[in-house]
Regions:
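Juxtamembrane/disordered regions of integral membrane proteins
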Residues: 1-163
Length: 163
């Protein structure tokens, strides 16, 4: 069962991840440190060298935003977590109001739990095996936390229009 998803919120959350990344990796914030730790030097590279990673980031950010909206919808929208509903309950699902505070709180908590259990855990595992500097791992994991928190806030303040 697919819960109601506010695709405008998903698009806004996707764009928010791009803004967070642009600020985080700017030279005045963490960009210089990140370039030093990774050895990446963007100067002199063709434009396509940045376009492809940005397009990939946009796509996976959309997937992440949609996935969080789906999880939060399954948890908070009445009826979406119980597939054995009868017809009357299904109808009630579509007219039942969404508790906006619960939706927001669930979005934030779910985002942080999913970040810790999937994003941070996987980053740390891969970086440990690849021998990446701990400072780089921390920089990237904290960036992902900030990104997920902002994304979760956007999803959380803009629930589906079932209310």
């Amino acid at each position: 069962m697919i819960p109601a998803i506010n695709y405008w919120a998903v698009i806004a959350a996707t764009l928010s991840t791009m803004v967070v990344g642009a600020v985080w990796y700017s030279k005045g914030v963490m960009g210089t440190r990140w370039m030093k730790l990774t050895g990446v030097q963007p100067e002199g590279k063709p434009a396509i060298a940045i376009v492809v990673p940005l397009l990939v980031t946009l796509l996976v950010s959309f997937i992440t935003s949609w996935a969080l909206a789906w999880v939060v919808g399954m948890i908070t929208i009445p009826g979406h977590s119980a597939p054995e509903l009868d017809n009357a309950e299904i109808v009630a699902t579509f007219v039942a109001p969404i508790d906006r505070f619960a939706f927001f709180g669930t979005a934030l908590v779910a985002g942080i739990i999913l970040w810790a259990g999937f994003t941070a855990a996987r980053f740390i595992t891969h970086d440990a095996f690849e021998g990446r500097p701990v400072k780089l791992t921390v920089l990237n994991v904290v960036h992902e936390l900030v990104t997920i928190v902002v994304l979760s806030i956007v999803i959380g303040v803009w629930p589906p229009a079932l209310a």
